[in-house]
Amino acid sequence: MRALSVGVSPTAAVDTTVYTCPRGYYSKFTVMYIHNTGGSTKHITVQWFDASANSTLDILTQYDFTSKNYLQFDGNAYIVLEEGDKLKITTQSASSFSFIATFEEIGLTRQ
């Protein structure tokens, strides 16, 4: 198992891929921090792209954050991403966010 954190400051109103599960691995998506660093209330959408089903599922849909507010997801639950699955975000136009996610990458032989 390899722990990996990924951080991005996405361009506003652009579909941004935060993470793609590499070939030969599956990943546990365990932690997510989202922070509105801008000066006004703006929203963000967080999505999981499931490559095996070729479908996209919303984790958060246009979730509003007031200025300087943040959200933290962590705990005993996680989402399992398989080869080619992606974590993607899209923020509202004229927004400023920071986004950090942590994954545990594990070889395809589940333990």
Label for each model-derived stretch:
Residues M1-T37, E83, T90-Q111:
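C-terminal interaction-tip segments
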Residues T11-T16, F65-L71:
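Solvent-exposed, conformationally flexible loop/turn segments
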Residues G39-Q62:
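Short, surface-exposed beta-strand/strand-loop-strand elements in extracellular ectodomains
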Residues Q47, L87-K88:
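Short conserved beta-strand and strand-loop elements enriched in small hydrophobics
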Residues L60-Y63, N76-Y78, K88:
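Beta-strand-rich interaction surfaces with strong enrichment in secreted/lumenal proteins
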Residues N69-G84:
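Beta-sandwich interaction modules
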